Amino acid sequence: MNFDKKNSFFSWINSKIKKNNKKEKKENILLKKEKEGIHTIQNIDNKKIDFLFKLKNSLNKTKQFFGDSISRIFLSKKIDDAFFEELEDTMLLSDIGVHTTDQIISKLINDATHKELKNPEKVYFLLKEHMYSILNRVEKPLKISNHTPFVILVVGINGTGKTTTVSKLAKKYKLAGKSVMLAAADTFRAAGIEQLQILGKRNNIPVISQSSGSDPASVAFDAVKSAISKKIDVLIIDTAGRLHNKLHLLEELKKMVRVIKKLNLSAPHEIMLIIDACNGQNTIKQTEMFHKAINLTGLVITKLDGTAKGGVIFSLANQFLIPIRYIGIGEKTTDLVVFNSNDFIKSIFVK
């Protein structure tokens, strides 16, 4: 073999080796990505399982009172008038409410008759389907739009956990990379102002406040003005707890909305009512009065982990069709979770 041929041969060999090395390297990269993908999916699956376990535990009182009772009724071998009467009684006792219970039972009887269903198990899953459809209509997570600032006005009666919810929301949005500002418009309660100021200091979140007894609308105005000038992403305004039947207090909220609109016509972008699930059917009248006064755009239902009255969520969803943004199932920030109708149904039904 002459010199030129020898060089040509070795060049060809080197070229093949390089190609093989590149191919092997590419395959290794693809294999690594595939493994990482599987690992990521497994992590996501594990997180979902952990979350559902936490949710089921938190809703255990509602499940015991509603889900277990419903399940026992369906052990009956006969679908008749007595069966539906017992089912109706159980739903009423579970705080689902007269209007919503009547609707569900009527639809269930109609569907069971039309489909000639005599099997309790099939009727059970039909009930589950009907109740899921009620919640699914209000499963609309809050999306922070490009409005700067995105203004959230938080309202509710005393003791529902408004300021605590404001704190959790602020932490959530900050962790999501948003710049956040708080407004302490609960000027009737010095402790409420102080609570927000402490939160702001700990989490490096600016808090706009005035002295106790100041006009809440003035605080809201200052906060929106400041948030605009500082180009804040999310402004959350905490308000004083007010009874839904005190019309002059609801007028104050209307005034706050008007004042906010003077600076930003599209704001507030979210008017969020905080509801304590422990109040059961009393929350219906609260929601009605607040909605009538200031046109609510979202609900947060708190303290679901401490009550058997979680059935009220069906009544709220069915009667008002106001999006349920979050539910509270514990004390931690992570226990304020985006509402998911499918997860909720899975957690309160036995099967």
From Swiss-Prot:
GO terms for cellular component: cytoplasm; plasma membrane. Pfam families: SRP54, SRP54_N. SMART domains: AAA, SRP54, SRP54_N. GTP binds at residues 156-163, 238-242, 302-305. The keyword Cytoplasm applies. The keyword GTP-binding applies. It catalyses: GTP + H2O = GDP + phosphate + H(+). One of its GO terms (molecular function) is ATP hydrolysis activity. Its EC number is 3.6.5.4. It is found in: Cell membrane; Cytoplasm. Its main location: membrane. Keywords: Cell membrane, Cytoplasm, GTP-binding, Hydrolase, Membrane, Nucleotide-binding, Receptor. It is a peripheral membrane protein. Disulfide bonds: none annotated. InterPro entries: AAA+_ATPase, P-loop_NTPase, Signal_recog_particl_SRP54_hlx, SR_rcpt_FtsY, SRP/SRP_N, SRP54_GTPase_dom, SRP54_N_sf. GO terms for biological process: SRP-dependent cotranslational protein targeting to membrane. HAMAP family: FtsY (MF_00920). Belongs to the GTP-binding SRP family. FtsY subfamily. Part of the signal recognition particle protein translocation system, which is composed of SRP and FtsY. SRP is a ribonucleoprotein composed of Ffh and a 4.5S RNA molecule. PANTHER family: SIGNAL RECOGNITION PARTICLE RECEPTOR SUBUNIT ALPHA (PTHR43134:SF1). Involved in targeting and insertion of nascent membrane proteins into the cytoplasmic membrane. Acts as a receptor for the complex formed by the signal recognition particle (SRP) and the ribosome-nascent chain (RNC). Interaction with SRP-RNC leads to the transfer of the RNC complex to the Sec translocase for insertion into the membrane, the hydrolysis of GTP by both Ffh and FtsY, and the dissociation of the SRP-FtsY complex into the individual components. This is Signal recognition particle receptor FtsY. It comes from Buchnera aphidicola subsp. Schizaphis graminum (strain Sg). The gene is ftsY.
